Regions:
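Cationic-aromatic interfacial patches
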Residues: 34-117
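Short, well-structured beta-strand-loop connectors
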Residues: 203-214, 246-261
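Surface-exposed, glycine-biased beta-strand/turn segments
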Residues: 110-222
């Protein structure tokens, strides 16, 4: 009986914690949007678009046959089954231009992009050197930013992007995409990811199959950092890690442990900063999670 009571108490405690985490996930996430669909024909070619036509969102597309596509003057790669993806950054304009080549002529399709609403987040207690870096650190920051930009420019012909994404860590959402950040009382750039707070050493997993494109133990702002390539211009970043467990060019599978949560770089406590880009467009990671 004592064992049974103890077992039930533990089970109840776990369920309560799970309910609280789900509530906080809904409370703190900007992602309360339903997916939209858009279907149309370009000549005889049927085009299907599905996703989030909103700042910070993305849409996945499919064509009935091979066709040349441009989006904002970028050539779009068609993968297996003629699938492709487009992304709209945090401050994307209200109109997006998608072009299709029919008989050597470009046909324009205008997409309407909704405006998003963003929160304000105040973070105090950061070391001064991370809020206003000393001049002698500038070259290092520029060099590290170039490494990150190089990975984000990749247009790999792999289709992992179309897998359902897993949440890369268990924990509490403490920071949301797009929020305007005030660090130690000073306005700074918006937050381009989500923060998942958890105990130091908690596991971080890959949300899909991927290729490791960057693996660093100590970047200035982000500390232990991993960048994964999912294909079609979609890359993801995992920051502030206490341990990096994968190497550059490793091919990893969905659910593989890639690192451990920490508080390295510009951080006030152990958490994962998870970000997703479509090339240079910053996207809301929570929009990639199927069962939110």
């Amino acid at each position: 009986k004592i064992f049974s009571k103890r077992h039930n108490w533990r089970r109840k405690k776990i369920m309560n914690k799970l309910v609280i985490n789900i509530f906080l996930l809904i409370l703190f996430s900007n992602n309360c949007f339903a997916k939209d669909e858009l279907k149309f024909f370009i000549g005889k070619n049927k085009i299907d678009l599905e996703g989030y036509f909103i700042q910070g969102g993305y849409v996945k597309g499919k064509t009935s046959s091979k066709i040349k596509i441009k989006f904002e003057n970028r050539d779009i790669y068609l993968g297996k089954k003629n699938k492709f993806i487009l992304g709209f950054g945090r401050d994307y304009s209200e109109v997006a231009n998608l072009k299709f080549n029919i008989d050597n002529k470009w046909v324009n399709k205008t997409l309407k992009i909704k405006k998003n609403k963003y929160k304000i987040q105040k973070i105090d207690g950061l070391p001064k050197k991370f809020v206003s870096p000393p001049k002698e650190i500038y070259e290092r920051i520029i060099r590290e930013n170039k490494l990150i930009a190089k990975v984000r420019s990749l247009n790999s012909k792999i289709d992992y992007t179309f897998q359902d994404f897993l949440l890369p860590a268990n924990g509490i959402i403490t920071g949301v995409f797009g929020s305007q950040r005030i660090l130690n009382g000073k306005p700074r750039r918006p937050h381009y990811g989500i923060d998942i707070a958890a105990k130091k050493g908690s596991k971080v997993i890959s949300p899909t199959d991927a290729i490791v494109r960057l693996s660093k133990k100590d970047l200035y702002f982000t500390g232990g950092t991993i960048m994964l390539d999912h294909g079609h211009g979609i890359t993801s970043v995992y920051s502030h890690l206490s341990k990096v467990l994968v190497k550059k060019n490793d091919k990893i599978q969905k659910g593989d442990v890639i690192g451990l949560i920490g508080s390295t770089g510009r951080s006030t406590g152990p958490h994962l900063d998870w970000r997703i880009n479509w090339f240079d467009q910053r996207l809301d990671p929570m929009m990639f999670i199927k069962n939110k």
